[in-house]
Amino acid sequence: AFGDAAAPADPALADTLLALVLAGTKTATCWDARDGLKGSAVGDCWVVLDGARTPRAVLRTVALEKCRFDQVSAEFAWLEGEDDRSLAAWRDGHRQFFEGDGHFAPDMWLWCERFELVAVL
């Protein structure tokens, strides 16, 4: 799945996010800071799996910062590349995602990561 070696809860979402990465539209991602750094550090490379858990791309982390959900910038929302790329759409989509994951608060902390595509597998 996108950035996660575990079986994706939503294979279609994993495939959608991967397609955005491969098109060059998605160059950032974020996750609940309570999940830790997941081994990420600037300069590290990681493999992206598709919804069937097949390795499809290698990415390199170029920036990583901790940020509150309600302080995520319009620039970061644009870099995530999802929906219409607006901050409003980003907030709505990610609020729904985190609520579905069992935890959401406007002031929750996120790890916000920017990456570059190194290789297509």
Go through each PLM region and give its residues.
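Mixed-charge, low-complexity intrinsically disordered regions
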Residues: A1-R60, L64-L121
